[in-house]
């Protein structure tokens, strides 16, 4: 399963790089491939959701179906880092069409010194609920060049 996720992540990063317009490169610890995680019975468990934050200022989120290699893009957009704890995502494409065009300020912090665990907090569009997400960096260590 992890191998499939790494291959899919590499594929989408490569496709994004080829098709992306020339943009100013973003230098940030946010850049990378992230897998959503949560706790189940007190244990950390990865979920089949990937977020790719690219250095060209774009991001994408996808759901990977269990048991096969297909998946579904759930959202695409751009992001802008406001400061060392807030960035904004602007959603350009979303599987829920009413989300398209929204700009969402997101609080972020790293839960560890190695910057491998990312915590995101944001409000829903109506401002009535705060969502908190945990993301684990997918490492490319050990992959031969």
Language model feature labels by segment:
Residues 1-4:
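Positively charged n-region of N-terminal signal peptides that target proteins for export
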Residues 6, 15-74, 88-145:
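Lipid interaction determinants
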Residues 11-12:
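Repetitive helical segments and hydrophobic/amphipathic motifs
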């Amino acid at each position: 399963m992890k191998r499939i996720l790494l291959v899919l992540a590499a594929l989408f990063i490569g496709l994004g790089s080829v098709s992306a317009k020339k943009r100013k490169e973003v230098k940030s610890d946010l850049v990378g491939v992230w897998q959503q995680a949560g706790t189940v019975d007190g244990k950390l468990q990865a979920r089949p959701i990937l977020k790719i934050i690219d250095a060209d200022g774009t991001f994408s989120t996808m759901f990977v179906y269990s048991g096969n290699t297909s998946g579904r893009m759930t959202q695409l957009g751009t992001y802008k880092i406001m400061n060392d704890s807030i960035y904004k995502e602007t959603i350009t494409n979303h599987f829920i069409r009413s989300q398209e065009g929204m700009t969402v300020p997101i609080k972020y912090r790293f839960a560890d010194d190695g910057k491998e665990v990312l915590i995101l907090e944001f409000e829903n569009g109506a401002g009535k609920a705060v969502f908190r997400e945990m993301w684990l960096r997918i490492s490319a260590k050990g992959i031969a060049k």
